[in-house]
């Protein structure tokens, strides 16, 4: 807690050698740490802070802060605490407790040049208890000299004794340097390693090496490069904030922001007996067809009624050869008492036997139209429909039995056209989904669509099998 070189540099050179007399309370404080004189120079007053080190009034963590609320120093300065880095405030508090000695008193107390040169060494001895044993070994007569001798040094006195005592000057220069860093030495010796006992037993050159080593690392107690600052940095403990920062830098902990959340929606495609086409915006109510048996409104794509499974009228295309025998078939059916409107219904098994002699080709085409029922397009405008429920059931049985056998042979008139995808192979691959299917591509192209999980190109329904 001393000002050091920076504190003394703020005082003019002429005032540094000015003799001052401390006030009684300040003098009592100085004598409590070994001072024996009544007058001092301003430089000695500024640099004599052994009281703070003796009482250990400084903060252990922030050593530049001094707490003196319950001490004599607090009564002297009138403040509970202060910082040694605030030079201006310290100088003001010190000047309040000093009285400048007049020049007449200084001349009356003037002594020889050697006394004026050696007396500061004695004063330093009194103020620096660490260097007291060294001074007793180096010069025993300096202790017996009067303590009230003048400390004024003039340029002429320095020139007269320039060649007289080179060793003393070197030692004095060394003392001035070590005295400026006395508090820094005390910090190192008292707080860190307690080296004061070993330092007292060494001679002057070894002590000078120690002081020079300290002064190399510290220029001033108040500088940023001071011993206390280096000491605090050397033994600095990382705070919690810095520790958290290092952990986050190293990536050892992940915060909630690093978590990625994905929202997944799972749709369960449950199959029903009848495919639902109500969600298709392209299909309007006008496209629905009405069953002739039960008057049920059915979607346009399924060929069978959802309620009674009756085949839709005009589902399959009408053969030209069939138009030739429409009149004769109609007359025979009317004779048998069967209701056949417009002659567009397919004949029953009895009617087929009766018309075999007149139109042999009709029976062949009827069987072909029944076999190709599963592979026809829903967009055809005309078809042949069975007239009873028994015929419908028989047709369904034949459809399941002959489905795999007639994949390539049973084509409708629309199946003669090439595949709409490759435009090269015939339409022999039926895309089946639910109870319906579409014949619009060849078998290889249909397999590719199924393998790639593509929907049906016609109705956009998921493909179940080919």
From Swiss-Prot:
Q: Where are the zinc fingers (RING-type)?
A: 419-460
Residue ranges for the region (Interaction with MTBP) are 160-292
> Which portions of the sequence form the region Interaction with PYHIN1 and necessary for interaction with RFFL and RNF34?
140-216
Region Disordered: what ranges?
A: 109-174, 197-223, 238-260, 319-407
Q: Where is this region: Necessary for interaction with USP2?
A: 1-101, 262-466
The linked condition is: The gene for this protein is overexpressed in some tumors.
UniProt domain comment: Region I is sufficient for binding p53 and inhibiting its G1 arrest and apoptosis functions. It also binds p73 and E2F1. Region II contains most of a central acidic region required for interaction with ribosomal protein L5 and a putative C4-type zinc finger. The RING finger domain which coordinates two molecules of zinc interacts specifically with RNA whether or not zinc is present and mediates the heterooligomerization with MDM4. It is also essential for its ubiquitin ligase E3 activity toward p53 and itself.
Quaternary data: Interacts with p53/TP53, TP73/p73, RBL5 and RP11. Binds specifically to RNA. Can interact with RB1, E1A-associated protein EP300 and the E2F1 transcription factor. Forms a ternary complex with p53/TP53 and WWOX. Interacts with CDKN2AIP, RFWD3, USP7, PYHIN1 and RBBP6. Interacts with ARRB1 and ARRB2. Interacts with PSMA3. Found in a trimeric complex with MDM2, MDM4 and USP2. Interacts with USP2 (via N-terminus and C-terminus). Interacts with MDM4. Part of a complex with MDM2, DAXX, RASSF1 and USP7. Part of a complex with DAXX, MDM2 and USP7. Interacts directly with DAXX and USP7.
Q: What is this protein called in UniProt?
A: E3 ubiquitin-protein ligase Mdm2
Q: Which organism is it from?
A: Mesocricetus auratus
What taxonomic lineage is listed for the species of origin? Eukaryota, Metazoa, Chordata, Craniata, Vertebrata
């Amino acid at each position: 807690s001393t000002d050091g070189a920076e504190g003394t540099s703020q005082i003019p050179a002429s005032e540094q050698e000015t003799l001052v007399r401390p006030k009684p309370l300040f003098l009592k404080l100085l004598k409590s740490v070994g001072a024996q004189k009544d007058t001092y120079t301003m430089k000695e007053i500024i640099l004599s802070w052994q009281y703070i080190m003796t009482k250990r009034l400084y903060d252990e963590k922030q050593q530049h802060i001094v707490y003196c609320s319950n001490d004599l120093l607090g009564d002297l300065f009138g403040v509970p605490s202060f910082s040694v880095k605030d030079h201006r405030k310290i100088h003001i508090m010190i000047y309040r407790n000093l009285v400048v000695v007049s020049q007449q008193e200084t001349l009356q107390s003037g002594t020889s040049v050697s006394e004026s040169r050696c007396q500061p060494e004695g004063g330093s001895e009194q103020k620096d208890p660490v260097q007291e044993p060294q001074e007793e070994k180096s010069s025993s007569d300096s202790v017996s000299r009067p303590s009230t001798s003048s400390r004024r040094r003039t340029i002429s006195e320095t020139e007269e004794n320039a060649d007289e005592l080179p060793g003393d000057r070197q030692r004095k220069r060394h003392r001035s340097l070590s005295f400026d860093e006395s508090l820094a030495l005390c910090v190192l010796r008292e707080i860190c390693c307690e080296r004061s006992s070993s330092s007292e037993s060494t001679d002057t050159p070894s002590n000078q090496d120690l002081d020079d080593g300290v002064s190399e690392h510290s220029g001033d107690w108040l500088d940023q490069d001071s011993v206390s600052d280096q000491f605090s940095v050397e033994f600095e403990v990382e705070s919690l904030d810095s520790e958290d920062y290092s952990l986050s830098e190293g990536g050892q902990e992940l915060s909630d922001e690093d978590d990625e959340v994905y929202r997944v929606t799972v749709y369960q495609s449950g199959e029903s007996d009848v495919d639902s086409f109500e969600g298709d915006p392209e299909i309007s109510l006008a496209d629905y067809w009405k069953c002739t048996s039960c008057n049920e409104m059915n979607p346009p794509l399924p060929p069978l009624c959802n309620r009674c499974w009756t085949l839709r009228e005009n589902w399959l295309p009408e053969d030209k050869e069939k138009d030739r025998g429409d009149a004769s078939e109609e007359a025979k059916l009317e004779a048998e008492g069967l209701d056949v409107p417009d002659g567009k219904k397919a004949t029953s098994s009895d009617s087929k036997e009766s018309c075999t002699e007149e139109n042999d080709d009709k029976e062949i085409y009827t069987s072909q139209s029944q076999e190709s029922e599963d592979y026809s397009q829903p967009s055809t405008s005309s078809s042949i429909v069975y007239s009873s429920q028994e015929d419908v059931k028989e047709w369904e049985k034949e459809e399941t039995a002959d489905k795999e056998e007639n994949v390539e042979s049973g084509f409708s008139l629309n199946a003669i056209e090439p595949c709409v995808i490759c435009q090269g192979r015939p339409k022999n691959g039926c895309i089946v989904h639910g109870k319906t299917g579409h014949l619009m591509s060849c078998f290889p192209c249909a397999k590719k669509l199924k393998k790639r999980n593509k929907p049906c190109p016609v109705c956009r329904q998921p493909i179940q099998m080919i």
